């Protein structure tokens, strides 16, 4: 095993990232040491780089969370992860590890807690596998945040519907796919050029979020279909007010629940008899680890085996290894649509 490895290091708040050498860590009892083959980028990565939010606790820092790679070594207590040489998907975030740079994704060797490491199917490339971890965790946490079990299976007789606002984003695409496994009738919003993609992922109807009458369009569709819509996931900023406008017309006297993935601003809009909950995993280590095991070893692993879930959205691969990460984050910050940026290592 290598004594040192390359990492894209954030030396101080504001960056820039630069490639340097770090000592290769040994896995703790519950860790998996992974040789990283591909990393996917998320908006929180450039927020941490540029603004230190979510909080970066230790500098120099290694950012990132989404990886696919090969198992190098298992911690002494790890029994649920395949052994050395196995291809895996891994959630490798330093945020939940006290800022430890040994756990960040943007390096050629990283540690990940075993609850977030599962086999990568042979049918998927490392680049395709890297898109899953944070987006799936966020999408699935939205359901448990509003009190749903991940083994829920509605039937058409139940007539349960959900609204997903921002469905062509990475999180949104997995929100749609997971909603399908839960048995919801799915109403989704996206830019028109992404409607076909969102439908292939499982949405029953997709609407242009920029349309001036999008609220009335969705309300009319819900009434026409005769379903009950009192559940929603706001994946993107700007979604809450139109979501509440729709629920006001569709929920009737039933209580409604909204999972909100962006941070809720002060003074955000509200609706009577409607819970609006910030979507974020528990900060309690025991509860979070249990939830991660349910998400990754339970739901995602099974869904990949059965083919109920696919890699989404479309990936844009950036070559150049770790040296390309900083510029790729700038590209993400400047805006991409219906695309997940992945850097091949």
From Swiss-Prot:
Region (Disordered): 1-26
Record-listed E.C. numbers: 1.-.-.-
Annotated coiled-coil segments of the chain: none
One of the record's GO molecular function terms: oxidoreductase activity, acting on NAD(P)H
Superkingdom of the organism of origin: Eukaryota
First and last residue of the signal peptide: none
Residues that coordinate or bind NADP(+): 44-49, 168-171, 191-194, 209, 244-245
Pfam families: ADH_N (PF08240), ADH_zinc_N (PF00107)
Pathway: Secondary metabolite biosynthesis; terpenoid biosynthesis
Annotated GO biological process: terpenoid biosynthetic process
Nucleotide-binding found in the keyword field: yes
InterPro entries registered for this protein in UniProt: ADH-like_C, ADH-like_N, GroES-like_sf, NAD(P)-bd_dom_sf, PKS_ER, Trans-enoyl_RdTase-like
Keywords: NADP, Nucleotide-binding, Oxidoreductase
Function description: Trans-enoyl reductase; part of the gene cluster that mediates the biosynthesis of talaronoid C, a fusicoccane diterpenoid with an unprecedented tricyclic 5/8/6 ring system. The first step in the pathway is performed by the fusicoccadiene synthase tndC that possesses both prenyl transferase and terpene cyclase activity, converting isopentenyl diphosphate and dimethylallyl diphosphate into geranylgeranyl diphosphate (GGDP) and further converting GGDP into talarodiene, a precursor for talaronoid C.
Family: Belongs to the zinc-containing alcohol dehydrogenase family.
Protein known as: Trans-enoyl reductase tndF
Origin organism lineage: Eukaryota, Fungi, Dikarya, Ascomycota, Pezizomycotina
């Amino acid at each position: 095993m290598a004594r040192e490895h390359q990492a894209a290091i954030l030396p101080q708040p504001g960056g820039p990232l630069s490639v340097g050498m770090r000592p290769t860590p040994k896995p703790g009892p519950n860790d998996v040491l992974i040789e990283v083959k591909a990393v996917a980028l998320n908006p929180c990565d450039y927020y941490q780089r540029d603004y230190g939010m979510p909080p970066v606790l230790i500098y120099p820092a290694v950012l990132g969370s989404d990886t696919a790679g090969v198992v190098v070594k298992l911690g002494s207590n790890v029994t649920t992860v395949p052994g050395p040489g196995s291809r895996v998907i891994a959630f490798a975030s330093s945020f939940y590890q006290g800022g430890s740079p040994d756990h960040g994704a943007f390096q050629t060797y990283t540690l990940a807690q075993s609850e977030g490491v599962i086999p990568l199917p042979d049918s998927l490339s490392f680049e395709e596998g890297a898109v899953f971890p944070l987006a799936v965790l966020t999408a699935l946490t939205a359901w448990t945040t509003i009190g749903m079990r991940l083994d829920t299976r509605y039937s058409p007789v139940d007539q349960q519907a959900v609204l997903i606002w921002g469905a062509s984003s990475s999180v949104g695409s997995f929100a749609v796919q997971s909603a399908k496994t839960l048995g919801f009738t799915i109403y989704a919003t996206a830019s028109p050029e992404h409607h076909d993609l969102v439908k292939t992922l499982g949405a029953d109807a997709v609407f242009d979020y920029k349309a001036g009458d999008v609220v009335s369009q969705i309300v009319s569709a819900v009434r026409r279909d005769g379903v009950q819509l009192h559940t929603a996931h706001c994946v993107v900023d700007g979604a809450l007010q139109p979501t509440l406008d729709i629920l006001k017309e569709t929920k009737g006297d039933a209580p409604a629940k909204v999972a909100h993935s962006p941070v809720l601003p002060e003074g955000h809009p509200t609706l009577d008899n409607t819970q609006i909950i910030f979507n974020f995993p528990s900060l309690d280590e025991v509860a979070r680890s249990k939830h991660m095991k349910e998400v990754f070893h339970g739901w995602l692993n099974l869904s990949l085996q059965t083919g109920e879930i696919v890699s989404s959205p479309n990936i844009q691969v950036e070559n150049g290894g770790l040296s390309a990460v900083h510029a790729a984050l700038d590209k993400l910050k400047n805006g991409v649509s219906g695309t997940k940026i992945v850097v091949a290592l």
